[in-house]
Amino acid sequence: MYRWRGNPASTAYARDVPATPARDSYHHGALREELITASLKLIEAEGIGAVSLRRVAREAGVNPGAPYHHFADRSALLAAITVRGSALLEQSLREARQHAPTAAAALGALIEAYVRFAAENPAYIHLMLRPELSHPENHPEVQAAGEGAITLLTEVVQDCQREGSAPPGDPATLTGLVWALAIGIVTLWLDGPLEARCVDLGTTPGELTARITALLTGLLAGQPPRGERGG
């Protein structure tokens, strides 16, 4: 359903694991991971509403009471998945930043990495965009885990300002702008309109994201769009 430059593959969780393995096939330590994997597959196939501890236990092929050894309730399960997704996203963003030659390139790379992560791991992103489902008042680790990506983006924005490839001022405002752009692209992609629009434009979501990112970084650096440059 989701395509990134033609041929992505999920790297965060297995999608081809049989839904109902034998009930005696899990050791205690492995069960938690299988419950998370089963939940991710349910979210991608049927949406977040399909996830309950009883349903996840059935998908994992274990006793209905088994999930309670690891998760007190549904929100605890969703919180654990959200924390996992936030950590994986932050790792992807750090890798993207590491290979960028300039701060401006790093900013563009972070936007593309975020959108690519969402395309390859939609179940994680659906949860991360709905933090209230994890009841953050009971699971403060959800908000703490999400701060890593924001902190990283803010650092890159500040690097751009020092480099002269972004306007001076409060970095939090510019960070919010970039974050909103990335989430907007992701939301349009996961909900469907972006792919349809790309078909009309004769491009792909990945290519369109790269073009939008290049336009944004150019504007921040004070460069007009190509069609408006003099000479």
Task: Describe each region flagged by the PLM.
Residues 31-39, 56, 81-85, 89, ...:
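Generic hydrophobic, amphipathic alpha-helix propensity
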Residues 71, 130-134:
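Short helix-capping/turn signature of helix-turn-helix
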Residues 74, 81, 85, 89, ...:
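Hydrophobic/aromatic residues within well-ordered alpha-helical segments
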Residues 108-130, 151-154, 179-190:
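Helical hydrophobic small-molecule/effector-binding pocket
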Residues 1-30, 41, 100, 193, ...:
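N-terminal intrinsically disordered/low-complexity leader segments
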Residues 137-143, 147, 161-212, 226-231:
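Hydrophobic/aromatic-rich alpha-helical bundle segments in the mid-to-C-terminal region
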Residues 80, 94-124, 146, 171-178, ...:
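Hydrophobic alpha-helical connector segments
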Residues 34, 38, 42-76, 80:
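Helix-turn-helix
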